Amino acid sequence: MYKRQLFIQYIRIKSGYFQQLVEPNYILGLNYFQRFFRMARNAEKIGGRDESHVYREIFKSQAQNINIKKLEIRITPDFDVANKNGIQKYELAERMLKKSILLNVRRVITEYIEYCKMIVNYEGDMETWYAQLNKCYEDGRSGFPSIGIVYHFQKRDYLDNKIGDMCWRKYVQSGTAPAYSKHMLVWRKQIVNCVKAIEELRSSIPYLAEYIVGIDAASNENSMEPWMLAPAYRTIRNRKITKPIIMNDNGDFLRIPNIGFTYHVGEEFRHIMSGFRHISEVIEHFNYKAGDRLGHAIALGVDVDQW
């Protein structure tokens, strides 16, 4: 009797485990993807691991493939940081946001350097360290891809004015919006302020543009229309805040590359015409250039007659 109960418990645990690893047929792909990685993030927090440890594990796992030349690190901006401790003034909120962005970049670069030191047992001599890294790469023991940070904005379900609540108008007009709000215009303004801060930093700190390389918008496409994020994409390439060159400490002029665009679109739609429309709006209204990306854009590969 005891062995039977023990076996039943084993089956239950095994079933619960595989439910999280094997995608069932009744769950759509994107929803499963979101649920799985949300649980993974929560597991890291429960285990007491900080972000630094997570970054190092990412580098360790990805660098095993020496064919990887570039590695994108996606970071979601912390909008809550701007309004901690009751800070509401725009100047202070902007400064806090820029500080948060720079701390994120510093954390990624620092952990990548620490990973490289861990690979070859760094002992303080830079020239020897570089030689060891080159030999490690040439021998095929590990890869060292270049790092690119992409700021990732999530499309969210928003609250409309179903009950006549017009407080979001006051938020937008006064500039004292709460850090987290689902009112669509408040959320859009926060994203615009964030991309403006990103580009101002890229244009004022030498070499930073080589690390912050792009912005991305993903998550459930049906939650938010493209027009919600169009102002953010246009703002970050506005000539009023972008600069073509920057001078470093040695007096050399450095070219500032354009930030890259990715927008996940045409991947989840109720009708194929909606998918086509979203793709068209992104290309037409987001100031896209050569090299910018459409995320998946599955609608373009669908046979219309079969649909």
Where are these regions (language model features)?
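Metal-cofactor-binding active-site regions of metalloenzymes
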Residues: 1-307
